[in-house]
């Protein structure tokens, strides 16, 4: 017995050393100083095929969305829909609504201005021509900050990082055009479409064409209150306007201004004030409503396209639904942790979950923990229908043009979530091998940096690394 245990232990050590040696060969393809944590395991197996620093904590980046999606399906269900309503507790007499009109925003990340227009049209058709009261923008479904802890300040005005507020219209993103002045030294000017309720100021200096100063005089945007923005920096003279897009910073103010304009366009007047309602109130009579697509459809978009807005509104909604409190980042984090432990049997231990999208630099997770999540997904995919929502290598989403996987010959064989931040290239998902086995894998690659002169070709080492790694996984399992 002792001898057999010795042989088993020796065999395990040999297997591990071979694994480590093989992974070290892959790592030689990466830039100096890159950090890799990697785990590969057959679905349903008790031990990994490759275990390389699988307990090492790393930034998950957008692989975080896998956890968010699983917790959402368990807590909210695939048929859950975000709902936006127009409500009142008053009565309509001779075309006059005697009481306040409440626009209750339910954090629908897909709500559009046209949807608000349609709800206002329904209100008009119900016989309301005048409101004897206030118009309230109800955002009570969420509370606290709309920006998660650990989001970089310089991303805040970018549309991919638009605050996932209770009130979202057209993804809380707007576009402008910046025109250089005819004369160098004069201020460039901005044009904003009238249907965007924002105010833009230009402090952008026009430079002569080819000016050396342009290299270090960068455009920047400074957000202010009530969706006022100041654009600073320089713009070399150009014949065409420069298109730009920015994230709305105050979702409630933005949505309120849009609703106010749509009421005006519909010929509905009111005697009161446009106000924000943040405290939870009993609902009134619903006079118009709009529902989103089912959650499963939204999660598919979220995972395929790595949609941060959907991920973070869903994350906060999970906290709201789990604890019956306004959705906050902390409520979402605690809810996800509890759901995974109690209903999926996955204890995420010392994992740090700060948001649902993976944008936060506070997030930390080990490959071994993510592997538990993937194993649960694979073993319950008949009821979850999860793997089909992931990007498919060579075909769609963020894996459609993943060169390393294409060179590995695994197009159509890999379904996985990507995760990218500065110096981070992650993958978490599944590969169907040449023998027909389904393997789960977690690749957390960070500290990836190249020389400034190599920036144009910075992904070449990544392509070499991934092509060799996934070709071997595909062929040898």
UniProtKB/Swiss-Prot annotation:
It is an enzyme of class 3 (hydrolase). GO terms for cellular component: periplasmic space; plasma membrane. It catalyses: Preferential cleavage: (Ac)2-L-Lys-D-Ala-|-D-Ala. Also transpeptidation of peptidyl-alanyl moieties that are N-acyl substituents of D-alanine. One of its GO terms (molecular function) is endopeptidase activity. It is found in: Periplasm. Keywords: Antibiotic resistance, Cell cycle, Cell division, Cell shape, Cell wall biogenesis/degradation, Hydrolase, Peptidoglycan synthesis, Periplasm, Signal. Its EC number is 3.4.16.4, 3.4.21.-. It holds the Pfam family Peptidase_S13. It comes from the Bacteria. Residues 1-20 form the signal peptide. Pathway: Cell wall biogenesis; peptidoglycan biosynthesis. PANTHER family: D-ALANYL-D-ALANINE CARBOXYPEPTIDASE, PENICILLIN-SENSITIVE CARBOXYPEPTIDASE A. Belongs to the peptidase S13 family. This is D-alanyl-D-alanine carboxypeptidase DacB. The gene is dacB.
């Amino acid at each position: 017995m002792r001898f057999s245990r010795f042989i088993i232990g020796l065999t395990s050590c040999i297997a591990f050393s071979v694994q480590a040696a093989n992974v070290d060969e892959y790592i030689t393809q990466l830039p100096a100083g890159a950090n890799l944590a990697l785990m590969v395991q057959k679905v349903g197996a008790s031990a990994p095929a490759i275990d390389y620093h699988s307990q090492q904590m790393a930034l998950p980046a957008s692989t975080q969305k896998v956890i968010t999606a699983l917790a959402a399906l368990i807590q909210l269900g695939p048929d859950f829909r975000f709902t936006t309503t127009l409500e009142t507790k008053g009565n309509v007499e001779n075309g006059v609504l005697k009481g306040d009109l409440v626009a209750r925003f339910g954090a629908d990340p897909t709500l559009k201005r046209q949807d608000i227009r349609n709800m206002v049209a329904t209100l008009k058709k119900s016989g309301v021509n005048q409101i004897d009261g206030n118009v309230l923008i109800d955002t009570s479904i969420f509370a606290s900050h709309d920006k998660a802890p650990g989001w970089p300040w310089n991303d805040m005005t970018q549309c991919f990082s638009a605050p996932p507020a209770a009130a979202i219209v057209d993804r809380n993103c707007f576009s402008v055009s910046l025109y250089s002045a005819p004369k160098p030294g004069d201020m460039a000017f901005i044009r904003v479409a009238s249907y965007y309720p924002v105010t833009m100021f230009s402090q952008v200096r026009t430079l002569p064409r080819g000016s050396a100063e342009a290299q270090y005089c960068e455009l920047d945007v400074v957000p202010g209150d009530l969706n006022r923005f100041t654009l600073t920096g320089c713009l070399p003279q150009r014949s065409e306007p420069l298109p730009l897009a920015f994230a709305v910073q105050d979702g409630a103010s933005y949505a309120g201004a849009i609703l106010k304009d749509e009421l005006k366009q519909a010929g509905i007047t009111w005697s009161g004030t446009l106000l924000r309602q943040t405290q939870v109130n009993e609902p009134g009579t619903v006079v118009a409503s709009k529902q989103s697509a089912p959650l499963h459809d939204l999660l598919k978009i979220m995972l395929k396209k790595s949609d941060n807005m959907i991920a973070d509104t869903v994350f906060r909604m999970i906290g709201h639904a789990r604890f019956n409190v306004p959705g906050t980042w902390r409520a979402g984090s605690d809810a996800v942790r509890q759901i995974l432990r109690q209903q999926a049997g996955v204890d995420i231990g010392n994992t740090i979950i700060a948001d649902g999208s993976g944008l936060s630099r506070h997030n930390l997770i080990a490959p071994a923990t993510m592997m538990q999540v993937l194993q649960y997904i694979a073993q319950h995919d008949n009821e979850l229908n999860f793997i089909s929502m992931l990007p498919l290598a060579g075909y769609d989403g963020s894996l459609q043009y993943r060169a390393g996987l294409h060179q590995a010959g695994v197009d159509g064989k890999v379904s996985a979530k990507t995760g990218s931040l500065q110096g981070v290239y992650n993958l978490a998902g599944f590969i169907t091998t040449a023998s027909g086995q389904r393997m789960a894998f977690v690749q957390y690659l960070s500290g990836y940096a190249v020389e400034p002169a190599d920036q144009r070709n910075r992904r070449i080492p990544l392509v070499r690394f991934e092509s060799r790694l996934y070709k071997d996984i595909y062929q040898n399992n």
